[in-house]
Amino acid sequence: MSLIGRLNLGRRFCTAVPRRSEDIMSNPDCRPSDLCLRVSYLIRCVGDLDTAAKYARLAVFTSIKSESTTTICQSIIGGMLRDKRLKDAYDLYEFFFNQHNLRPNSHCWNYIIESGFQQGLVNDALHFHHRCINSGQVHDYPSDDSFRILTKGLVHSGRLDQAEAFLRGRTVNRTTYPDHVAYNNLIRGFLDLGNFKKANLVLGEFKRLFLIALSETKDDLHHSNYENRVAFLMATFMEYWFKQGKQVEAMECYNRCVLSNRLLVCAETGNALLKVLLKYGEKKNAWALYHELLDKNGTGKGCLDSDTIKIMVDECFDMGWFSEAMETYKKARPKNDYLSDKYIITRFCENRMLSEAESVFVDSLADDFGYIDVNTYKTMIDAYVKAGRIHDAIKTSNKMIDATLKEVSHLF
């Protein structure tokens, strides 16, 4: 039996598990919010999953089972699965939810199902999904993310009919909006098989269901989202036409859904369009769209996110436009609070542009509100060593130790 097949959804008594927090570590602090911060720090900033797992196990002994308690479980299970440590992830799932009867959230179940698909265990993943529904433990399962994972996994496995049935079953309620990413998975699956007619029917079904839900709910926010969601799907049709060598048809899709409508593109849709335009040589249109997103960001008329900026900076690096990469980054950086300097520092180091990386790194150190994680320090240390600047490598290493000790003293 596979690991995922062994997971239970019911409580199971086992004597070989810790019964007190002191069985895990001495003098434990089991306050949920503080424990959550520690686990998150160990996963994201240090990358020490083993120590994070040790602290995460204390979650079962928190006096108040809050949202933070569930987030701890979600974070460590997700971290283990991203690191391909499947047995450790499943052992933690068993420990939290079966041996100690904590209540999972939809993210925990989604992680397990996604890992099943990634291993090719389609039937096991589907069986686990159905058991999750039947258990009734989580009120918001299946979520939008659940359907995205299910449709992607089923399409990848060649089970397009099953994926379509999942989506059809979800939208029986007239007030339920169809999810554009899940529908895009199905559309892409049919287009990859060359079945344009069926893909077009799925697009039409998405539009029909969206408009029905809109008429029932009278939701102004979703009304403004409708054209963006359709444009997101049209990016997949654009790529289909480009692959066929039919540039005119591809750009007709773009003109029809964006230019002729003067669509104020959201970040998610913009990113999908930018990737296709750049991939198939429509660079002038891509840069025009990017500058429109940049100009309208923060005005309430349009937006970009950190991925938008990375797409265009990556394009500069791919073309060998290094000064333009820095200029693009610097212009966009003040308009996005979530873009980490780690990204541009890493890209400069990858391209042996140590002086440029050092410039951004020094600015980050001087920023009182900035935060540099351990991996960014390590990137700079490696770059200094490769350049033969051992003194700078040692100095940066000492700064990393000081910053880490300061952070640890606050958290632990």
UniProtKB/Swiss-Prot annotation:
It holds the Pfam family PPR. PPR repeats lie at residues 69-104, 105-139, 143-178, 179-213, 230-264, 266-296, 305-339, 344-371, 373-407. Residues 1-18 form a transit peptide. It is found in: Mitochondrion. GO terms for biological process: response to oxidative stress. Keywords: Mitochondrion, Repeat, Transit peptide. InterPro entries: Pentatricopeptide_rpt, PPR_domain-containing, TPR-like_helical_dom_sf. SUPFAM superfamilies: TPR-like. GO terms for cellular component: mitochondrion. The keyword Mitochondrion applies. Belongs to the PPR family. P subfamily. NCBIfam families: PPR. This is Pentatricopeptide repeat-containing protein At3g60980, mitochondrial. It comes from Arabidopsis thaliana (Mouse-ear cress).
